[in-house]
Amino acid sequence: MAEKSNPRSLLNGRALVVGANHRSSSMILRDRLFVEDEAVPFILERLKNAGIDQALVLSTCDRVEVQAFCDGDVANEDETARRIVEVLAEHGELGPSEMDGQTYVHWDEQAIRQVFAVTASLDSLIIGEPQVLGQVKASHRIAKDAEMTSTGLETILQAGRKHMAVVSVPVRTNPKTRESRLFKHPIQFLEQSIATML
């Protein structure tokens, strides 16, 4: 049973989210990191050159975030996350030290929680903000066009949209539902979502 609730075994790989948002970073840093839609393919190409084969880049006023998936195992978590931070820093013309303490890195279950939270607009400055799903969809479309998505990332993103459908209305009407609705069983929700895709 433990294996069944492990996202690594469910997905045969590792979910990873690296970013800077309104809680982790200054507005000045986020402004420097902001990625216009037309620049996203270049960032995705740099990520691919850095060894990241599945990723989307979500850039809004609240965050700049790379949602990624690594097939199989990851030899060095810190090195993998560092490469993503370096790509973002290069885009923002920032030195790595300027990013220190202003970014977050989530792996596996925590990464999936983050994807779900962002998609459902639970991690926004304004909880339940309806524009977020459109921003996620646009980022997903750009990643697909750049051939930067495959089974692992697609599965997580589809589950995130299903999760959003479950929580978005209650959250918009009562933000106090945030913790109980989102964080109770994200991996079980992912399992159920995968089962409906098979």
Show where each model-derived region lies.
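A glycine-rich (often HGG/GG-containing) alpha/beta subdomain
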Residues: 2-124
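Glycine/serine-rich phosphate-binding loop and adjoining beta1-alpha1 elements at the start
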Residues: 98-197
